[in-house]
Swiss-Prot record:
One Gene Ontology molecular-function label: serine-type endopeptidase inhibitor activity
Gene3D superfamilies: Thrombin Inhibitor (Hirudin), subunit I (2.70.10.10)
Protein name: Hirudin
Organism of provenance: Poecilobdella viridis (Indian freshwater leech)
Reported function: Hirudin is a potent thrombin-specific protease inhibitor. It forms a stable non-covalent complex with alpha-thrombin, thereby abolishing its ability to cleave fibrinogen.
Keywords recorded for this protein, A-Z: Disulfide bond, Glycoprotein, Protease inhibitor, Secreted, Serine protease inhibitor, Sulfation
Lineage: Eukaryota, Metazoa, Spiralia, Lophotrochozoa, Annelida
Record region (Interaction with fibrinogen-binding exosite of thrombin): 55-63
Length: 63
């Protein structure tokens, strides 16, 4: 299972199930095999801060 940190603003926003952006302090489980991303709370193992299919980045002009 891959976790990435989610923040309310910045370059590391995760679009998760229901098109919800994870709030600050939450983790995003990147979906695999057709599964949707899910927001979770609590501790997780952060994944590498790389450009993966499950990542979502806002263009800077919208920050």
């Amino acid at each position: 299972v891959v976790y990435t940190d989610c923040t309310e603003s910045g370059q590391n926003l995760c679009l998760c199930e229901g098109s919800n952006v994870c709030g600050q302090g939450n983790k995003c489980i990147l979906g695999s095999d057709g599964e949707k991303n899910q927001c979770v709370t609590g501790e997780g193992t952060p994944g590498p801060q790389s450009h993966n299919d499950g990542d979502f980045e806002e263009p800077e002009e919208y920050l």
